[in-house]
Amino acid sequence: MTATLERRESASLWGRFCNWITSTENRLYIGWFGVLMIPTLLTATSVFIIAFIAAPPVDIDGIREPVSGSLLYGNNIISGAIIPTSAAIGLHFYPIWEAASVDEWLYNGGPYELIVLHFLLGVACYMGREWELSFRLGMRPWIAVAYSAPVAAATAVFLIYPIGQGSFSDGMPLGISGTFNFMIVFQAEHNILMHPFHMLGVAGVFGGSLFSAMHGSLVTSSLIRETTENESANAGYKFGQEEETYNIVAAHGYFGRLIFQYASFNNSRSLHFFLAAWPVVGIWFTALGISTMAFNLNGFNFNQSVVDSQGRVINTWADIINRANLGMEVMHERNAHNFPLDLASIEAPLVNG
């Protein structure tokens, strides 16, 4: 009898725990994805803060030339970064217990792998949590689908690209200047500016900014006034009101006359779908482009593609970009190899005499 009561009590305790985890009445929804999201993001955040402040220099290129990234080792907010795991580690899983000491783990850039892997797990679970909360509330699942774009982009630069290049040392450093360095080196090695998927991403981000500004300004300019002239029109909105807060017909008429009739949406639902889909699809394509360039399927090469009748090269902007790429290639990792791959692979010119 005692055993039966104890079993009921424990089952009830588990049931209460499940109800609390999945309750939509909590101030912040936890969910089953949140059970994994909370510890992984807390771990990534806390290790990032500690390492950004105090991590010792990291031998990123595996040539016994450590690079400093933390504030206590001479950096500021702009130049500081979590330095990627050493090329000597490559793609090996490198937890603390795989190193001979904590000093060795820090020297080889172990914190980078720890932060990145926990961060990617955390943001993936955040996306799952968005879907889970939408499901509990009877909403459609498109919030999580939209969030998949930045998740895909982060996964591309922190995981897929290092896998394709063979080392976590090629991942994006976790800092401002480190991000710029990653972008410059990526351009030098893969010519990303000439990749059509990157072009789609630029159109997605800049277009999304433009459409967001256009939509916000149109709505703000066509509010239905519920206040006197002496009060702000914004004060006329009551949270949860059933009435439309702006006149979509007026906004449609304005924009249709500004551009042309069919450039303006007359359906609020398709308008907002478009506002969400445009940047999301663009960022999906960029993430896909990074993932293909990870395996060296690079941007277009139009170098020396225009020649005159005598066979002399007429330079185009593609040749100017190529010259810049060579300069960036020469300057990065300048002690890791004697010649950049692009230059070392060119046959030596013939010398007469």
UniProtKB/Swiss-Prot annotation:
SUPFAM superfamilies: Bacterial photosystem II reaction centre, L and M subunits (SSF81483). Pfam families: Photo_RC (PF00124). Tyr-161 forms a radical intermediate that is referred to as redox-active TyrZ, YZ or Y-Z. C-terminally processed by CTPA; processing is essential to allow assembly of the oxygen-evolving complex and thus photosynthetic growth. The modification N-acetylthreonine is found at residue 2. The record marks 190 as: Stabilizes free radical intermediate. GO terms for molecular function: chlorophyll binding; electron transporter, transferring electrons within the cyclic electron transport pathway of photosynthesis activity; iron ion binding; oxidoreductase activity, acting on diphenols and related substances as donors, oxygen as acceptor; oxygen evolving activity. It catalyses: 2 a plastoquinone + 4 hnu + 2 H2O = 2 a plastoquinol + O2. Signal peptide: none annotated. InterPro entries: D1/D2, Photo_II_D1/D2_sf, Photo_RC_L/M, Photo_RC_L/M_CS, PSII_D1. Pheophytin a binds at residue 126. One of its GO terms (biological process) is response to herbicide. The keyword Coiled coil does not apply. It is a multi-pass membrane protein. The chain crosses the membrane at residues 29-46, 118-133, 142-156, 197-218, 274-288. Residues 345-353 form a propeptide. Chlorophyll a PD1 binds at residue 198. 2 of the reaction center chlorophylls (ChlD1 and ChlD2) are entirely coordinated by water. Belongs to the reaction center PufL/M/PsbA/D family. Photosystem II (PSII) is a light-driven water:plastoquinone oxidoreductase that uses light energy to abstract electrons from H(2)O, generating O(2) and a proton gradient subsequently used for ATP formation. It consists of a core antenna complex that captures photons, and an electron transfer chain that converts photonic excitation into a charge separation. The D1/D2 (PsbA/PsbD) reaction center heterodimer binds P680, the primary electron donor of PSII as well as several subsequent electron acceptors. This is Photosystem II protein D1. It comes from Psilotum nudum (Whisk fern). The lineage of its organism: Eukaryota, Viridiplantae, Streptophyta, Embryophyta, Tracheophyta. The gene is psbA.
